[in-house]
Amino acid sequence: MLTSLLLIVVLLISACGGGNTESAAPEAADGGEPIVTSERCGEPSQLSDSVSFYNWTDYIDPDILTMFEEECGVDVIYDTYSSNEDLLAKLQAGATGYDLIIPSDYMVSIMLQLNMLKELDHSNIPNLANLYPRFTETPYDPGNVYTVPYQWGTTGIGYNLEATGEVPDSWDWIFDPERAAQFEGQISLLNDQREVIGAALKYLGYSMSSVDPTELEAAKQAILAIKPYVATFDSDSFGDILVSGDVVLGVGWGGGYYQDIAESGNDNLGYVIPQEGGTIWTDNLAIPATAPNPYTAEVLINYLLDPEIGAKISNFTYYASANQAAEPMIDEEVTGDPGIYPPPETLEKLEFLTELGEGTLLWDRIWTEIKSE
């Protein structure tokens, strides 16, 4: 699977009306004729009054949602989460009002096993044609039966050069206790068990998706050894606290760091993929099986796959796009950065997180022990 997924990214470097019965099209405030929608809005008579979008924090330009609302006459009810596990837990707890979600690759596999995703009607998503070909045959969902790739990226280290003195291009900077002690109270880790335990496993030379009890115990001990120097576990504002100076080192998603660093204008701040490697991932648009407004969700997916919109997304998130038609409009600042579009020699060292199967319970226990000790 790793080879197939890696090929997706290497080739990137080298190189959207349905039949369900949702509520009627929005009417004018005075109860008159329906609002005239743009050609990007599907069949107006089938659009619902609103669509509920559950997304990662800071993972879309808010202007895009406003544009969709104004063009299509549909209110976007927007909510955010901080990890795939939070998303899964929310849905398993009985949340049935969400129309569109964005699970990562390994979480798609889990949700498919649990019958949690609705099959897509491709006739409502003609902009699927805008995807890079390899993103139409992902190992976790060949043919985009249930999902549409949205963005892809990496997990690495954010840093303040004034404090570190050099680019911290190794996991040693995080997991070596003697080195971490130099930055006591100034290190942040993601509040994400797959990423943090995975990074510790990588530091130790193991698979980032290991379910071996001995290897996982070693990873736990490595994290506990540096926990006294960790200021916070944060998946929402890890970039903000680097910019503010509250921390000088952190583990986080590349685009999250790039967004806040770009806004700060501080040339001493940066993001690096460790030389040992790290996580590479693909996030995907998907519709929960319980979605009340699947047609409108498909129209929103198609809207997000528009080339102009796709470029606007990446120019805001600082993540790489699965949308080939959007690439010419993505800022060179994004496409030319090796931390966003890594070179082949870096890609070879990156891993996709894979489903843990029965090992999930062990990972859950170890994460609980890490957070509670």
Question: Model regions: which residues?
Answer:
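Mature extracytoplasmic/periplasmic domains
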Residues: 288-348
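C-terminal motif of bacterial Sec signal peptides marking the signal peptidase cleavage site
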Residues: 11-15
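A ligand-binding cleft/hinge motif common to bilobed small-molecule-binding domains
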Residues: 107-110, 249-267
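Extracytoplasmic ligand-binding site segments that recognize negatively charged/polar headgroups
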Residues: 52-61, 86, 97, 102-246
